[in-house]
């Protein structure tokens, strides 16, 4: 009977392992996701600790990496011009400058509420703008998020968590330390075998 008791947990463990088994590719993807989430959290902490001037440069770098704006000099002139009726800057939506996106960048710790967004939208109306992006290191209240869903002009809200994710995705402030190449059999090569 003692032997049977020791066999049962082993059998249960083996069965449990089979049920929860992931393919090596799935394990690699899950680990990659955990690494990127941890990296994004570290990036956000560093962004929040940085100066407002650094945050403005970061916004320029990120938008350029995302394909907005023309040159670094053009984008740099567009950001950080405070005191312009609630608009921190403008940047071209594309390299040709066919459309303009108005920006508000706030390095805040707390939540940005609907009143702040309404001020920004009012400033956009004053410029007859069709598009705006409000970027913060903090978060947005549910009222702010709900408000922008049904208004014209189109306003995109980017909170601190999303800023960090975009920085990781577009390689702003991060560097690649290792690359893994996952390979499979090339069926075409063996087609005539």
Which residue ranges define each predicted feature?
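Mixed-charge (Asp/Glu-Lys/Arg
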Residues: 1-193
């Amino acid at each position: 009977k003692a032997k049977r008791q020791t066999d049962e947990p082993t059998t249960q463990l083996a069965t449990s392992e089979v049920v929860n088994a992931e393919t090596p590719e799935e394990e690699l993807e899950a680990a990659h996701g955990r690494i990127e989430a941890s990296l994004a959290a570290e990036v956000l902490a560093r962004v929040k600790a940085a100066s407002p001037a650094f945050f403005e440069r970061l916004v320029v770098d990120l938008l350029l990496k995302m394909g907005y704006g023309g040159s670094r000099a053009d984008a740099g002139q567009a950001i950080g011009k405070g005191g312009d009726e609630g608009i921190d800057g403008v940047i071209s939506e594309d390299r040709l400058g066919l459309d303009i996106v108005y920006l508000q960048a706030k390095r805040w710790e707390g939540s940005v509420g609907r009143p702040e967004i309404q001020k920004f939208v009012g400033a956009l109306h004053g410029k007859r703008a069709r598009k705006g992006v409000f970027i913060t290191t903090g978060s947005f209240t549910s009222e702010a998020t709900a408000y922008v869903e049904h208004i014209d002009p189109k306003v995109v809200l980017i909170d601190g968590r999303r800023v960090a994710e975009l920085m990781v995705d577009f390689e702003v402030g991060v560097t690649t330390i290792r690359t893994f190449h996952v390979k499979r059999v090339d069926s075409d090569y063996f087609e005539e075998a």
